[in-house]
UniProtKB/Swiss-Prot annotation:
Record organism: Shigella dysenteriae
Region (Activating region 2B): 123-124
UniProt-recorded name of the protein: Fumarate and nitrate reduction regulatory protein
Sequence segments annotated as region (Activating region 1C): 181-191
Cofactor binding summary note: Binds 1 [4Fe-4S] cluster per subunit.
Its job: Global transcription factor that controls the expression of over 100 target genes in response to anoxia. It facilitates the adaptation to anaerobic growth conditions by regulating the expression of gene products that are involved in anaerobic energy metabolism. When the terminal electron acceptor, O(2), is no longer available, it represses the synthesis of enzymes involved in aerobic respiration and increases the synthesis of enzymes required for anaerobic respiration.
UniProt region (Activating region 2A), positions on chain: 47-50
Region listing for Activating region 3C, in residue ranges: 85-87
Binding site for [4Fe-4S] cluster: C20, C23, C29, C122
Subunit structure: Homodimer.
Cross-referenced CDD domains: CAP_ED, HTH_CRP
Region Activating region 1A, annotated ranges: 71-75
Example of a GO cellular component annotation carried by this entry: cytosol
Length: 250
């Protein structure tokens, strides 16, 4: 039986709200490891925002840190602007990811966050979340795990750019996307790229022409099937090996 206070809260927040207890990607997000009472406390501080349209920003570089954002659906890219005025993409965030961690140190966002497609996010006021985490060890531990994952991702990206050639970079990018889709319950073999080839090239330090040429080469070799933005992994072993992994795609 659903407690009365939870029913009231759901009615007040509108029919489009999905609460932590019901969210299909909660195991990737803050609610993971929290008990029902802790989930209720977390649920009370979260604001379910209306859809973020393609091209809209969650925050801009220099903005004060007020909230973290948990992605419920869609894709968000983070980027900075170089001294020369060029965009430099620093990450692609999928459902279950939290955006805004890099602002905790200074209290201001060092980067921009922009929707690549219509996306749904949960806004989590940081000061309230920080206060709650001081009272709830499980929440604090989960926050540490999520931040650790962010650091590991940054380290992997540094290794990717410093050690791998163009083929290996793109293979690693596609392999990583495949694994992330699998974690979210989607097909790891067939998926749509929500980012442009220009975005992928920017992120990997490659030109658009190089990305297109490599995708054609991967398709010709039988490793991938490429149709517009749709990717089908035809040879898991070859992709994993080129990406520097020995484990097959799940």
């Amino acid at each position: 039986m659903i407690p009365e206070k939870r029913i009231i809260r759901r009615i007040q927040s509108g029919g489009c709200a999905i609460h932590c207890q019901d969210c299909s990607i909660s195991q990737l997000c803050i609610p993971f490891t929290l008990n029902e009472h802790e989930l209720d406390q977390l649920d009370n501080i979260i604001e379910r925002k209306k859809p973020i349209q393609k091209g809209q920003t969650l925050f801009k570089a220099g903005d004060e840190l007020k909230s973290l954002y948990a992605i419920r659906s869609g894709t968000i890219k983070s980027y900075t602007i170089t001294e020369q005025g060029d965009e430099q993409i620093t990450g692609f965030h999928l459902a279950g990811d939290l955006v805004g961690f890099d602002a905790i140190g200074s209290g201001h966002h060092p980067s921009f966050a922009q929707a690549l497609e219509t996306s749904m996010v949960c806004e989590i006021p940081f000061e309230t979340l920080d206060d709650l985490s001081g009272k709830m060890p499980n929440l604090r531990q989960q926050m540490m795990r999520l931040m650790s994952g962010e650091i590991k991702g940054d380290q992997d990206m540094i290794l990717l750019l410093s050690k791998k050639n163009a083929e290996e970079r793109l293979a690693a990018f596609i392999y990583n996307l495949s694994c992330r889709f699998a974690q979210r319950g989607f097909s790891p073999r067939e998926f749509r790229l929500t980012m442009t080839r220009g975005d992928i090239g920017n992120y990997l330090g490659l030109t658009v022409e190089t990305i297109s040429r490599l995708l054609g080469r991967f398709q010709k070799s039988g490793m991938l099937a490429v149709k517009g933005k749709y990717i089908t992994i035809e040879n898991n072993d070859a992709l994993a090996q080129l990406a520097g992994h020995t484990r097959n795609v799940a």
